[in-house]
Curated annotation (Swiss-Prot):
Assigned EC number: 4.2.1.19
GO cellular component: cytoplasm
Gene (UniProt): hisB
Family: Belongs to the imidazoleglycerol-phosphate dehydratase family.
Protein name per Swiss-Prot or TrEMBL: Imidazoleglycerol-phosphate dehydratase
Reaction(s) the record says it catalyses: D-erythro-1-(imidazol-4-yl)glycerol 3-phosphate = 3-(imidazol-4-yl)-2-oxopropyl phosphate + H2O
């Protein structure tokens, strides 16, 4: 089984996170940030992984440290669970509509970290959640997984719908990339390593 568990403790947050890439058991997510709980639940469902997260953070300031540190920890768990990346597709992409919004994700589990984030999130807050933290989250995931990640909202009006389309597209693209393909012998790279 491709699994990983990490604990990350700083002066600002305490994160316990585990993933199982080959299980679709019910995910248990409690971050202290309601909107992020919602998005991570969607991500887990659409990536068809089991994701468990327990986080305590300095949310009395804002959610920045909590959101970023969860992204870091998720990225580290993905990197560990994928190990040498033998026989995985490596690449994944998905378009996801959410009512009037359309989100797109393309990713490469290349071992090279990069994020392209192209989304106009016109509403700066959804409840207590600062929408600029969406990019911070994906930056942390991409750099700690060592993936090349492209996210784009092609169009839409409702900020919640735009973000939801991105998280679902990310989940679906990740599922494609991490799927073991029996036609791929070893690592899917001419370099022989990812």
């Amino acid at each position: 089984m491709r699994t990983a568990t990490k604990t990350r403790i700083t002066a600002e947050t305490s994160i316990e996170l585990s993933i199982n890439l080959d299980s679709q058991a019910e995910s248990i997510i409690s971050t202290g940030v309601g909107f992020l709980d919602h998005m991570l639940t969607l991500f887990a469902k659409h990536s068809r992984i089991t994701l468990n997260v327990k986080a305590d953070g300095d949310t009395y300031i804002d959610a920045h440290h909590t959101v970023e540190d969860i992204g870091i920890t998720l990225g580290l768990c993905l990197k560990e669970a994928l190990a040498d990346k033998a026989s995985i597709n490596r690449y994944g992409s998905a378009y996801v509509p959410m009512d009037e919004s359309l989100g797109f994700c393309a990713l490469d589990l290349s071992g090279r970290s990069y994020l392209v984030f192209d989304a106009e999130l016109t509403n700066p807050k959804l409840g207590d959640f600062d929408t600029e933290l969406v990019e911070e989250f994906f930056q942390a995931v991409a750099f700690n997984t060592e993936m090349n990640l492209h996210l784009r909202v092609l169009y839409g009006k409702n900020t919640h719908h735009k973000i939801e389309a991105l998280f679902k597209a990310f989940g679906r693209a990740l599922r494609e990339a991490i799927t073991i393909n029996p036609e791929i012998k070893g690592v899917n790279s001419t370099k022989g390593v990812l």
